[in-house]
Regions:
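Conserved phosphate- and dinucleotide-binding cores of soluble alpha/beta proteins
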Residues: 1-91
Length: 91
């Protein structure tokens, strides 16, 4: 994947934790997500409420590495990070 370059990486979350960040349930999935983040300028993450406040065994990235976070509900535990743009989908 190092031969490729992308403007935006849009990732789906396996698990998302306010302190631990993005994690994956499978090592190969975590490796691909890390490579996509390394090869892109913008990092977008999509997650629904079933993924937040969870952690899987394979850490991918901290929330500080994500530029835009798209959720289906507000996430009170997230706190306030001015570098992270949080978008809540309208139902």
């Amino acid at each position: 994947m190092s031969r490729y370059r992308a403007d935006i990486a849009i990732l789906g979350a396996c698990a998302l934790h306010a302190e631990l960040g993005l994690s994956a349930s499978q090592e190969a999935d975590a490796d691909v997500k890390r490579a996509m983040l390394a090869a892109s300028a913008e990092h977008w993450l999509v997650a629904d409420h079933t993924k937040v406040n969870h952690c899987e065994p394979w850490l991918v990235a901290g929330l500080s590495d994500i530029h835009h976070l798209f959720l289906d509900r507000p996430w009170p535990e997230l706190g306030d990070d001015p570098a992270l743009s949080v978008h809540i989908a309208d139902a």
